[in-house]
């Protein structure tokens, strides 16, 4: 990351500054603790940038810890993708990767300690009964008939759970707190449940697995985390976080702080809904460029710097809000406008023949790779008497606001000649198949000698040298700003979220590599697709347009 990415300030950093100034802490130690049961999305990027960014700015440490307490939903595939995403965003964890499963022996010992203190019991209510006994926000819960078992009985039953003596769902370990608490999370929460499933790290060693709320706080303490940062939905869970640490023998007691999660327009962040999009094949996978996943954004052409900048701009607060998609798009547009080399590609091609150009000949035209950065150099682009232009760049008749090619009028070809449209050929349906023009041979990259003004400029690709390319025009996945609020979020999928075109690109695009963007002049920002592109088939994804067409449509 560059020094230009200035250090932000927010309420969490103010707390850290106070903790360091008062001597409460002498160093800063954070962590990013994803569950490996799916791919990370842009919301996780906010947490990654916060936790790793704080550690970086305060010369502290940030752990990457996988909260792997549910073997049924987790997979090593997700572990690998999360590691890749964190590193791609420009961060690296302190020391080795941690797993909550590293602490299973200690977690079990702490559970036994709670039983010995009379603060945990084995419950044999069914999961449905536990929900029923828990009560509601307006009605207190009621005690389980198994709540007052003796310490000895609970120890024996917990050991029976550990050794596979109960079937799944037939017993669990619960904290003994207060079934009348105004906070439902404190109404004897489950600490351990039974799952006969092979774990990707521990194999079949365990058939009981700790719950998140029991695991999370102890893992933080064991790792010496100073500031445990969570999103706002875990605010009530802080009471349980503190209760567990207050009631076990552990020397460190981290403090949890909550910040607002990232909500983004025109997409969904729910793992369940994202999974439904994938499994029902509404998208091509977790890395589909329309998905809000980090892997999807990367494949679409977003840069790590643009995502970090986005997370910096939206800031860290305690108030939930929804961020406009235009804010994210603005970050990548600014990044690529500054850094992407230019190239020419025609997305909706129509043939244009220059009738007075020397037949069968061609020449090289010099073009800058970036109009404002001479240090990025230039390239030689072939020009000939037959070229492709975009169909939208020609009209037989047009008003004065139309600054492109019109029958009988002139336009400049980018970095080449001034041409004049003379006639067209059409097919049986009346569609234009060829535009015939003449050119002014004395206007190569300069104005006409007689002083006439030619205002319009269009891009082109020499037909004899053109590379056939597939162009995937990606757009917002949903047609409404808040698809999650729809009765059926699948019903508001944008039918135009992917339009595939067959076009032509200039020869320099043969050297394109996945992850490196171009500005296709006058069209937008594009990158080579990492899945479908091959040496024989160039496939480009539209990352973002040159301007926000959604804002214009909403005016």
UniProtKB/Swiss-Prot annotation:
Its main location: cytoplasm. One of its GO terms (molecular function) is glutamine-tRNA ligase activity. Gene3D superfamilies: Glutamyl-trna Synthetase, Domain 2, Glutamyl-tRNA Synthetase, Domain 3, HUPs, Ribosomal Protein L25, Chain P. A motif ('HIGH' region) lies at residues 34-44. The keyword Protein biosynthesis applies. It catalyses: tRNA(Gln) + L-glutamine + ATP = L-glutaminyl-tRNA(Gln) + AMP + diphosphate. A motif ('KMSKS' region) lies at residues 268-272. Pfam families: tRNA-synt_1c, tRNA-synt_1c_C, tRNA-synt_1c_C2. L-glutamine binds at residues 67, 212. InterPro entries: aa-tRNA-synth_I_CS (IPR001412), Gln-tRNA-synth (IPR004514), Gln/Glu-tRNA_Ligase (IPR050132), Gln_tRNA_ligase_bac (IPR022861), Glu/Gln-tRNA-synth (IPR000924), Glu/Gln-tRNA-synth_Ib_cat-dom (IPR020058), Glu/Gln-tRNA-synth_Ib_codon-bd (IPR020059), Glu_tRNA_lig_a-bdl (IPR020061). Residues 317-324 are annotated as: Interaction with tRNA. GO terms for cellular component: cytosol. Its EC number is 6.1.1.18. SUPFAM superfamilies: Nucleotidylyl transferase, Ribosomal protein L25-like. Keywords: Aminoacyl-tRNA synthetase, ATP-binding, Cytoplasm, Ligase, Nucleotide-binding, Protein biosynthesis. One of its GO terms (biological process) is glutamyl-tRNA aminoacylation. It is found in: Cytoplasm. It is an enzyme of class 6 (ligase). CDD domains: GlnRS_core. HAMAP family: Gln_tRNA_synth. Belongs to the class-I aminoacyl-tRNA synthetase family. This is Glutamine--tRNA ligase. It comes from Salmonella typhimurium (strain LT2 / SGSC1412 / ATCC 700720). The lineage of its organism: Bacteria, Pseudomonadati, Pseudomonadota, Gammaproteobacteria, Enterobacterales.
